[in-house]
Amino acid sequence: MGTERKRKISLFDVMDDPSAPAKNAKTSGLPDGGINSLINKWNGKPYSQRYYDILEKRRTLPVWLQKEEFLKTLNNNQTLILVGETGSGKTTQIPQFVIDAVDAETSDKRRKWLVGCTQPRRVAAMSVSRRVAEEMDVTIGEEVGYSIRFEDCSSPRTVLKYLTDGMLLREAMADPLLERYKVIILDEAHERTLATDVLFGLLKEVLKNRPDLKLVVMSATLEAEKFQDYFSGAPLMKVPGRLHPVEIFYTQEPERDYLEAAIRTVVQIHMCEPPGDILVFLTGEEEIEDACRKINKEVGNLGDQVGPIKVVPLYSTLPPAMQQKIFDPAPEPVTEGGPPGRKIVVSTNIAETSLTIDGIVYVIDPGFAKQKVYNPRIRVESLLVSPISKASAHQRSGRAGRTRPGKCFRLYTEKSFNNDLQPQTYPEILRSNLANTVLTLKKLGIDDLVHFDFMDPPAPETLMRALEVLNYLGALDDDGNLTKTGEIMSEFPLDPQMAKMLIVSPEFNCSNEILSVSAMLSVPNCFIRPREAQKAADEAKARFGHIEGDHLTLLNVYHAFKQNNEDPNWCYENFINNRAMKSADNVRQQLVRIMSRFNLKMCSTDFNSRDYYINIRKAMLAGYFMQVAHLERTGHYLTVKDNQVVHLHPSNCLDHKPEWVIYNEYVLTSRNFIRTVTDIRGEWLVDVASHYYDLSNFPNCEAKRVIEKLYKKREREKEESKKNRK
């Protein structure tokens, strides 16, 4: 044997002359690569012309200039923190740099490996993966894929997967060391979502057990020093953005109605400012759709004196094809030499950092976003419209300077910016119900939650509440250990209450119906209520209405959808959201597969039986027994145990005010509403959830006195049945 030793090429080694292929590519117009650079190494097909066109644009991105430095740094370190301004190209390019390096290192081409890039939002995971598939000249779902809740668009051929942070957490439950992955990239880490924060702690442990795994943490803001400290002094790399100067304007006085002010500002910009697209930040779907209608109407009233506009909404539940419209060009002038056209994007804070839209010159920032808030004392989690942070305001204004100098109109005072806005967005883990998170951690084998390495540890009270809820649901025993029921619950991508409702539904002989209800609750609202046809929409909804509540109304809609062969025309005629129904059908099929895996029976009570709806309502109560409200003599509802005054949401389908209701959602607005409610009977509380309705630790209220009577009634019935048996 000879003594010559081959040098093992390490992951991310940079070639002796790394510029050589790039030079060749630039001079020959070929992509980076070796001899076969005309052939796409990922699918074996020749590159298309579009690939070369996109490649030229990719080379102009700031991150491209630091490719070698990035690969060298990552080669020498297990963890790397990368800060890149939005628009630097980090989300699309870094994962591609990584898969090329991993591919170069993997000599056995049959060995499967994967690079994962997490996104906090579904829209970003889908949109970015499509863009990267286009850049790599491959088919989405093949070499490049994405995975979001209830939708997996990947295959065994996938080498690069964009996925929501929540989906990577779910994968960790089945594969605690994430063995399939060679590199994991946590993108948009500055957003500090609940799932990202849990992944921080989890991956820190995984890295100790897997020296071959690499981690890249990417952020758009300079809170990176905190990430560095957390990841034991990992190196920090900064990529500049392509920011032009942005002029910032504040209002002189606080705006009473930010929506009207935003619309007014759009019209003024369109009338008075030079060409350039507009980005408006609003808080949610309803507000955005309302603004889009009003902008079209206001500009339409101006006639020929202004150019044409294209108003495009952007929010998470928008169909993917509609989401892609944000990348369409602005409309051409109506007549040659006439006023220029303008694109107006009206978006949630998803356009802050997750997606980059070229052509934006004007940004309108009302200073608000919807944020999750949680009060552990009364166990209420709700989405509230809240002021944004200074960091978010900075990100928003930066959207205006991507292609040329821009302007940002902040619809609040400079004093308010300086004095009222927090420096950073409060991490989600500090303002969320942690029941689902605790269940996930328990499934991952992490029992000591108090000492789990959270970057920002949640309040002990919030953790205690989560443990208490899971104990009542039977997911944890009295010692805090995961039960068999808890293990099954953790497999469902649902909140713990809904998972429990599904698991126990066979005991009530109604699992088919509970599957349909769960699927309907897991998708956007199926009822469409256009402003110009509200009366007709309300009449259509009333036809599906069930007098005993909203859950049963949703069941009626699902049954009618299936009976009408999932016909889109039927949906249109009945003011039903066809996409939501198709999603519900897809969700239901996935839930059926999980039920089958655990041998949970598919069954239904005979539709003609008087117990048909009773059994469904009892099964729902078995999951949602902690979300019950009682009608007091005063005419308002009190949440049971927490004694919060609440009102039935106006959208409910009940034709009466039941004494007891279960509710799906607690909505905090000017009044406290409970939404998606169903009538239940008081005695069921005693039958289905006696462990929770233990009167020894019950606050004094009317509901307690009623339940006391129900317990006494049950005792009498037991005594009588004993006597009868004798």
UniProtKB/Swiss-Prot annotation:
Motif (DEAH box): 187-190
Helicase C-terminal domain mapped to chain residues: 265-445
Family (UniProt): Belongs to the DEAD box helicase family. DEAH subfamily. PRP43 sub-subfamily.
Domain Helicase ATP-binding: 71-240
Keywords for this protein: ATP-binding, Helicase, Hydrolase, mRNA processing, mRNA splicing, Nucleotide-binding, Spliceosome
GO CC terms, sorted: nucleolus; spliceosomal complex
GO biological process: mRNA processing; RNA splicing
EC number of this enzyme: 3.6.4.13
Protein's UniProt keywords contain Nucleotide-binding: yes
Reactions performed catalytically: ATP + H2O = ADP + phosphate + H(+)
Keyword flag Cell membrane: no
One Pfam family this sequence matches: OB_NTP_bind
GO MF annotation: an example: ATP hydrolysis activity
Function: May be involved in pre-mRNA splicing.
Record-given protein name: Probable pre-mRNA-splicing factor ATP-dependent RNA helicase DEAH2
Species name: Arabidopsis thaliana (Mouse-ear cress)
Residues engaged in binding ATP: G84, E85, T86, G87, S88, G89, K90, T91
